[in-house]
Amino acid sequence: MNDDSETPGAEAWMALPLFNRKASPDHEQNVLTWFECWRPPEDDVSDFKSLEDYEDSPTHSIGSSGLHSGSLDSDYHYYTASDLVFSDDGGVGRNADLLSEISDDHIPQLSFSTPSTCPFPGCKSTALFTTGRDFRRHYRQHFKRFFCRYEECSQSTNDPGDAGKKGFATRKDRARHEAKHNPAIRCQWRDNNGDQCTRTFSRMDNMRDHFRRIHGKE
């Protein structure tokens, strides 16, 4: 058999770029990186009230992260609350180590036949969840995979001794935080000479609040 022969599609497969960790903006800053080997099933858009909810959903947020194509649905398993084995020391395991590998793409699928509380160990929330959307949004806050990309920021690294208190659950939360390092929204108020207010803000609502409180009486 000729060594140069290739099966159909092999050349195209070989041309696919490998995932470049160094080029990734989240290099060495994602607590739970094992999900790079998995491709979760797509959510039905009808499960979400708005496009924003869909884009922020746990499974959809990694759709363009360079995962290899191909379905692994036969190997994919949604963990249920019964899979979480709570230990006396406050830890949790799926026969010991579930949380060491679980990502926010593997969230307990509660039945919601009755209002349910969060099963995450140590969760202090008293909220009762009646829909999967609200529960998923809450539950993934326990897994903060994104960290500030400004090195001097206290939110830029994950401190094992302070787990769960640093970082952000979604890219949107991180982007909102990072905007504070480089506020670019300038107050639009001008005085009688046409000179503009010098205050800048990272959020439009904060600028409007400033405008209303400070300049509204002028």
Swiss-Prot record:
Residues 162-176 have a biased composition (Basic and acidic residues). Disruption phenotype: Blocks harzianum A production and reduces expression of the trichothecene biosynthesis genes, as well as of mevalonate biosynthetic genes required for synthesis of farnesyl diphosphate (FPP), the primary metabolite that feeds into trichothecene biosynthesis. Leads to increased expression of 10 of 49 secondary metabolite (SM) biosynthetic gene clusters in T.arundinaceum and reduced expression of 5 SM biosynthetic gene clusters. Residues 154-181 are annotated as: Disordered. PROSITE patterns: ZINC_FINGER_C2H2_2. Its main location: nucleus. Keywords: Metal-binding, Nucleus, Transcription, Transcription regulation, Zinc, Zinc-finger. GO terms for molecular function: zinc ion binding. One of its GO terms (cellular component) is nucleus. It is found in: Nucleus. A zinc finger (C2H2-type) spans 185-215. Transcriptional activator of part of the trichothecene biosynthesis cluster that mediates the production of the antimicrobial trichothecene harzianum A (HA) that plays a role in Botrytis cinerea antagonistic activity and plant defense priming. Regulates expression of both trichothecene and mevalonate pathway genes. This is Trichothecene biosynthesis transcription regulator TRI6.
